Structures are given as C-alpha cells and as structure tokens.
Amino acid sequence: MHGESRIEEFIKSCNRHEHYAYIQPRPAQYAAWRGNHNLTVEYSEWVWKQSNCPSLKLNIPVPALDILEEALTNLSRFVSHRDNEGNSGWLSATIHGVDTHFTNAWNYYNFESEPTHTWTALADLCPKTKAWLESFPCTSYQRVRFMCLEPGGVIALHRDNAERGLDAINVAINNPANCNFYMEDAGTIPWRVGDVRLIDIGRYHAVVNNSDAPRIHMIIHGGWNMEILKQTCESYDELSRLHFQH
C-alpha cells in the first residue's frame, strides 16, 4: 500500500476516536500529591507512563508571536528533516544541540560518542526564543529544534518510541487551520497557538498541512525540573475533572 493511502486509512481510523477518550482516572493514592515531593514524583511518573494520555497541555506561557517572527526570519537556515522516510515539506533547525543543521539525534551521525549539546549559531539569531528557553522549567537541554511543515507538507505515519508514554515537549508556535496532528486511538491534538504539550510519541502519528501557511512548532528534549512535574500533576488533575465529571 503506497504512503498516501496508508495515511488516509490511518486518518479515518483516528477520526473514530476523541482525543482523550481512553485516559485513565487518577489513582486514589495520588490524591494528596500537593506539597508531597515523593507523591509528586510518583504521580507525574504515572501520568507519563500509565495514564494513557496522548497529549497533555502544560500551563507555561509562550511569546509565540516573537518566536514565530524569529523562526520565519531564519527559515532559509532550515534543512530537510528525515526526508528519506516518506515525509514531504518537513524542515528543521536546531537552536540547542550539536549544530544548527544537525536535526536528528546525535547517533544518527557518525560520532564515536555523544558530542556536547549547546546553543547553536541559530540561538544568536533568535534572542527572544533563547531568552524564553532560558526561563523554561528545565534542568538541562539536549536537542531543541524548530520544526516547520510547509503548506501541503506531510509528516508520514511513524512512531518515535517502542513504548507508549508522554515524552518530548511540543510547542505550537503557530498551528494553521487545516493542519492536523493525527494520533493512534486519539483523533487529533486540539492545538491552539502557544500550547506547550507533552506528547506520547510512542503512538503512531502523522501530520498533514492542508493550509497555505507553514506550520511552526518547537520540540524540546531535556531534563525536567520539579516545576514540570508539578505542572504535569496539575494539568492531569484538571483534565480528569473535565473528562470524568458526571
């Protein structure tokens, strides 16, 4: 089956499901997590690995218009990303990592050992984006990238991890109408501009940009501090209240 028809079939299967249809209720032992360090850690781990949550919006403000302006100004510096995997119009540029044009994981390239991840030359050209990232609740960064999906572009059906579970953070710098992120058993992600979401990239997913504008997101890999753990717990509590209310 060729790639397009495979995606079409996948989209039809996704559209049979609401995004949060199959999330799990919070276990009773985590009810008193607030103010309890160990419970906060345990509850956040449960959310990431066992809640069956496809994406979780965190309450982190984003200067989306400033970041979008910097990204679009530097769009000529973006390179094709994973274009040998059936993707089309998928571009990327690294602001923190090995180098601006090294958009895959370090072991994709021919390094003998993991190189230093640091601010790239692109960071100097995107000072507002860098300043926001420096205030982000993260203990350290690995790869931080701009991701662009051009008008008419497609991110082919794939998954990034073998196991389900919330993992990387995806930030919607913009998200044009008619650009949809389809997820296995979870419909589409209800993106709004400025959303910061933990994403389950162990699910099969695909993105199709049927708009006339480039879709600009950021993907953040790093070490999360306690603020991210607390945000995870607070966000899942709020999601649960909305989803399981009777």
Region annotations inferred by a language model:
Residues 2-135:
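Non-heme Fe(II)/2-oxoglutarate
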Residues 131-151:
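A short glycine-rich, His/Asp/Glu-containing loop-to-beta-strand
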Residues 145-163:
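Conserved short histidine dyad/triad with adjacent acidic residue
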Residues 167-173, 196-198, 212-230:
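A short hydrophobic beta-strand segment most commonly corresponding to one strand
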Residues 172-193:
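A short beta-strand-loop-beta hairpin characteristic of the jelly-roll/cupin
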Residues 189-205:
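Conserved metal-binding segment of the jelly-roll/cupin
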Residues 206-211:
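Asparagine-centered strand-capping/turn motif at beta-strand->loop junctions
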Residues 220, 226-246:
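Long, compositionally biased interface segments
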